[in-house]
Amino acid sequence: MAVYDTIILDIEGTVCSISFVKNVLFPYFLDKLPFLLEQVEFPLDHTDNVTVTQILAKFPERYTKSKECLKTYINELVANDIKDPTLKQLQGIVWQAGYEEGEIVVDLYNDVIEALDRWKKEDKSVYIYSSGSIKAQKLLFSHVKFKSETRDLTNYIKGYYDPTSVGSKIESESYLNILKDLNKDPESAIFLSDNIKEVAASIRAGIKSLVVKRPGNTVHHDNQSFDFVYSFDNV
């Protein structure tokens, strides 16, 4: 395998299980949502300088006229896994409280922490590109379960990207935007994700890209025109 000095990683299904997001983060958010909405007056005052109100006001106005209407709309977004940037902002606030209270910790795949340590020793730069907000990405990597303790792994990560900063993960232009921001050539970078559409977009940008196969991920047939890896051990 060629030598790369820039490693770009997806999160869900790549460094941690899809079930962590679906079975831990999403339910936690939905459980806290009613309490969050109880703290806000409806209809929303769009001139309010309270952070939560400002975020809620970004949802379509037809859904923000009442608490129940907005709650139903947000629940539908989550149920359908809609990558809505306003939803991501709101989730980030709720998850931050959960992480800080010790109610949320993330289990990374066993090979991930070892790889991050190895890449740092090899002077390689690691970046995260996820559909989750940059705030949520940083929270996740700063609250990692490791044996009997919680570790902060943000010192291993040089930078973070999300769709609001560089564009959609299934568009090749987004990966070119990352390279431009890093002042890197495509040949110096490698991208890893469990999502074939994301890998295809990255390849179109000229970046070496690998499909990560983890337990519980979507089944892909190895005869497709992609390179697969089952862990980060040989990356």
Curated annotation (Swiss-Prot):
Pathway: Amino-acid biosynthesis; L-methionine biosynthesis via salvage pathway; L-methionine from S-methyl-5-thio-alpha-D-ribose 1-phosphate: step 3/6; Amino-acid biosynthesis; L-methionine biosynthesis via salvage pathway; L-methionine from S-methyl-5-thio-alpha-D-ribose 1-phosphate: step 4/6. Pfam families: Hydrolase. Mg(2+) binds at residues 10, 12, 194. The keyword Cell membrane does not apply. CDD domains: HAD_EP. Keywords: Amino-acid biosynthesis, Cytoplasm, Hydrolase, Magnesium, Metal-binding, Methionine biosynthesis, Nucleus. Binds 1 Mg(2+) ion per subunit. GO terms for molecular function: acireductone synthase activity; magnesium ion binding. It catalyses: 5-methylsulfanyl-2,3-dioxopentyl phosphate + H2O = 1,2-dihydroxy-5-(methylsulfanyl)pent-1-en-3-one + phosphate. One of its GO terms (cellular component) is nucleus. Its cofactor is Mg(2+). InterPro entries: Enolase-ppase_E1, ENOPH1_eukaryotes, HAD-like_sf, HAD_sf. Its main location: cytoplasm. GO terms for biological process: L-methionine salvage from methylthioadenosine. SUPFAM superfamilies: HAD-like (SSF56784). It is found in: Cytoplasm; Nucleus. Substrate binds at residues 130-131, 169. The keyword Hydrolase applies. Belongs to the HAD-like hydrolase superfamily. MasA/MtnC family. This is Enolase-phosphatase E1. It comes from Komagataella phaffii (strain GS115 / ATCC 20864) (Yeast). The lineage of its organism: Eukaryota, Fungi, Dikarya, Ascomycota, Saccharomycotina.
